[in-house]
């Protein structure tokens, strides 16, 4: 049996994805009832960060500790993948001392190359092309609040970025319709649209995408590494803010999500996080539970392989 990794959502079957989402909610209930569950005592998670993140570090480190294991944090100062030592060599050495690895970096090819030479499961904590761990949390959150997302309509408002790409994959796997509203020049990459055009519809304005949506999602206008484009992007995205008026075009029980951190007054209105249908705090917490379910799945799959 081949070693299992989680670099994109499609590294799972739809059945496996649904099982992980169900398990995430089970683990959440166990945590809330103070039940101690430590199946991975002695297991070590390596966390390689070339892009910093508060939520990613806390959720993974807390998760493996709650499982009875431990985590090692490697900052850009500690390891520079592909700079000084080939990624392939780093992967062989690092994975020989760990049980599972999470990488948060820039180029998606970095996690692919690392996984190709790793002896243990590798999780994509975020790359420029994909953010699959966030989709696990988003899907779990929607299901907990509204039930199945199959057949629903999701509106993505803003940049056709890594989050948007992962939503495109999720639409294909989970059977929902995805309406994407982006300014000209900021649409998702053509290769993602070409493969999943059957479940995606593009719009050049936020209002049309929001009509009758069951879920509205957005992200920052300028991601890490795009700071020099901030002013240009503010101008391009000015008409793509998620606010109370836009929510009024959606289905009455439409949920609102944002992966955080959010910039009030930019991609969202000053009060959007306090909207009655905003579930961003549950969404943020569910990073912990969804990633615990993912780690449990990958570690158990690796044990089967052994």
UniProtKB/Swiss-Prot annotation:
GO terms for cellular component: cytoplasm. Keywords: Amino-acid biosynthesis, Arginine biosynthesis, Cytoplasm, Transferase. Gene3D superfamilies: Aspartate/ornithine carbamoyltransferase. GO terms for biological process: arginine biosynthetic process via ornithine; citrulline biosynthetic process; L-arginine biosynthetic process. Its EC number is 2.1.3.3. GO terms for molecular function: amino acid binding; ornithine carbamoyltransferase activity. Pfam families: OTCace, OTCace_N. The keyword Cell membrane does not apply. InterPro entries: Asp/Orn_carbamoyltranf_P-bd, Asp/Orn_carbamoylTrfase, Asp/Orn_carbamoylTrfase_sf, Asp_carbamoyltransf_Asp/Orn-bd, Orn/put_carbamltrans, OTCase_ArgI. Carbamoyl phosphate binds at residues 53-56, 80, 104, 131-134, 259-260, 287. It is found in: Cytoplasm. Pathway: Amino-acid biosynthesis; L-arginine biosynthesis; L-arginine from L-ornithine and carbamoyl phosphate: step 1/3. It catalyses: carbamoyl phosphate + L-ornithine = L-citrulline + phosphate + H(+). L-ornithine binds at residues 162, 219, 223-224. SUPFAM superfamilies: Aspartate/ornithine carbamoyltransferase. Reversibly catalyzes the transfer of the carbamoyl group from carbamoyl phosphate (CP) to the N(epsilon) atom of ornithine (ORN) to produce L-citrulline. Belongs to the aspartate/ornithine carbamoyltransferase superfamily. OTCase family. HAMAP family: OTCase. NCBIfam families: orni_carb_tr, PRK00779.1. This is Ornithine carbamoyltransferase. It comes from Acinetobacter baumannii (strain ATCC 17978 / DSM 105126 / CIP 53.77 / LMG 1025 / NCDC KC755 / 5377).
